[in-house]
């Protein structure tokens, strides 16, 4: 949860910190979203692998139980990504936010709050992590468009 939250706060601050170019910013934002995807898929893959190796035989024989559990991870992962962001928004000790000046920090805080709230309240809505990541990008774009 905290690692996914860290990726989310990095994403929010990257929207407002200086980059050599907008292309560099977009590439970094894509990298962070790709990292969220990779982290989630790696977790599910390792869980499934450990299930096959270590689950009690009675559970292994019950067809589809592992897959059922794995499908339930997505809302949990999204919730555990969102919740740690709330206290990080309210403190100046968070390194990601501390590197920004006043206005940029406020905007990054606000974006992080918007995304965290959205992920927490809508986490049951998505069937795949790809859907959730696409929603993060869409909400971010709406937020940034409102600033213009």
Model-derived regions, located:
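ATP/Mg2+ or Mg2+-diphosphate-binding catalytic cores
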Residues: 63-148
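Long, amphipathic alpha-helical stalk/connector segments used for oligomerization, subunit docking
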Residues: 42, 58-65
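Fe(II)/2-oxoglutarate
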Residues: 51-60, 74
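Active-site activation/catalytic loop segments of kinase-like enzymes and analogous catalytic loops
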Residues: 1-55, 81-99
């Amino acid at each position: 949860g905290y690692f996914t939250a860290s990726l989310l706060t990095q994403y929010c601050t990257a929207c407002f910190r200086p980059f050599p170019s907008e292309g560099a910013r977009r590439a970094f934002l894509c990298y962070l979203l790709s990292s969220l995807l990779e982290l989630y898929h790696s977790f599910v893959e390792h869980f499934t692998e450990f299930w096959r190796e270590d689950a009690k035989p009675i559970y292994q024989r019950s067809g589809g139980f592992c897959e059922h559990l794995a499908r339930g991870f997505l809302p949990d992962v999204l919730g555990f990504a969102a919740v740690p962001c709330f206290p990080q928004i309210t403190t100046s000790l968070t390194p990601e936010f501390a590197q920004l000046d006043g206005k940029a920090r406020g905007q990054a805080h606000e974006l992080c709050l918007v995304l965290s709230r959205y992920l927490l309240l809508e986490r049951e809505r998505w069937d795949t992590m790809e859907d959730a990541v696409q929603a993060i990008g869409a909400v971010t774009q709406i937020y940034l468009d409102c600033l213009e």
